[in-house]
């Protein structure tokens, strides 16, 4: 599939993820673009963050083969795409919890190595817990209201992060959002 001005965020994620995987490189989509995918674009991200421990030289080769140009550091832009691709350094984690397994989302454009909905919720809640960022809470709610998540895992992780009170706010917000979607 060719990258052009009509390529969606999900298609771009699949194209990049598939190219990396086929080159033997491991990188997992995280952050706001995962929320965009799992919220059916209720939240609109402007970049794709692939967390990786791979060497930049190896990433450069794959990204160049797709038509991307390195902007600075670990950022890439494609002349036909509105989205930037960034490669934050590993480790892949939510709060203090490392992530060792993730989702493989099959699409028409390829397979995306991506956080699970539960991991995405935890990723967004980590921002809410650390910085009291309401936008991160809203994004966690968007994902949890549309996809099954392991609420007991999120609860125990929240407790380990000393954030049981904010977790309860999240649970109430999800209940409210689900009732408004029905």
Question: Which functions belong to the PLM regions below?
Answer:
Residues 1-182:
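Compositionally biased terminal segments of proteins
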